[in-house]
Structure formats: structure tokens, C-alpha cells
Amino acid sequence: MRWVLAGLTALLLWLQGLLWFGEGGLNDVRGLSRSVEAQREEVDRLRQRNQALEAEVNDLKTGLEALEERARSELGMIREGETFYQIIEREDDAR
């Protein structure tokens, strides 16, 4: 009976060791939990970015002001009847 009890105790200790320190044990589970949390944060950040981009696309599709602003800043366009003045500073004046 003692040998059976000793064998079962040894088996229990071995299984506990696997649970705590083995592959797929609690350390791995903690690491995976941290990884999942980091990925959730990344997904939330990307969702917010997508929402901002979607709002910008909708604004460009429907709003003429945003379209005009982009045309002016990125393409250098001006309205009909406007005069464009570009002021260039001389190096002497820059000091």
C-alpha cells in the first residue's frame, strides 16, 4: 500500500510540474494572454484609424470644402479669378 501511495504522490508531483512548468503550462498561458491583450489593443488602434479614414473618404465624397482644401494644398490649385502670390525671402532678409 505504501508503494502505491508513493507512486501516486510521485505521479501527482510530476503532473503538477507539467502543469506549472511544461509546454502549454501556466507560464505559456500567461504569455499568450499578454499577446492576446496586445493584439486587441492593436486592433482597437487600427479600428480607430479606419474610422478616421472612412470619415475622411466620406467627407471627400460629399463635402466640397475638403476637396477644395486638398486641391489647394496638395496640387497647388487656385479658384477661377484668384491671383496666386508666392513670396520668396532672400537670404539676406532671412537673418
Curated annotation (Swiss-Prot):
Q: Which residues lie on this side of the membrane: Periplasmic?
A: 22-95
How this chain sits in the membrane, per its record, is:
Single-pass type II membrane protein
Question: Which coarse location class applies to the principal site listed for this UniProt protein?
Answer: membrane
Transmembrane domains' residue ranges:
4-21
Give me any GO biological process, just one: FtsZ-dependent cytokinesis
- What's in the keyword line of the UniProt record? Cell cycle, Cell division, Cell inner membrane, Cell membrane, Coiled coil, Membrane, Transmembrane, Transmembrane helix
Cytoplasmic-facing ranges: 1-3
Q: Which residues form a coiled coil?
A: 26-76
A GO term from the CC aspect: cell septum
Q: Where in the cell is it found?
A: Cell inner membrane
Q: Which HAMAP family match?
A: FtsB (MF_00599)
**Per its database record, what is this protein's job?**
Essential cell division protein. May link together the upstream cell division proteins, which are predominantly cytoplasmic, with the downstream cell division proteins, which are predominantly periplasmic.
Family under the similarity heading: Belongs to the FtsB family.
NCBIfam families attached to this UniProt entry: PRK00888.1
Q: What is this protein called?
A: Cell division protein FtsB
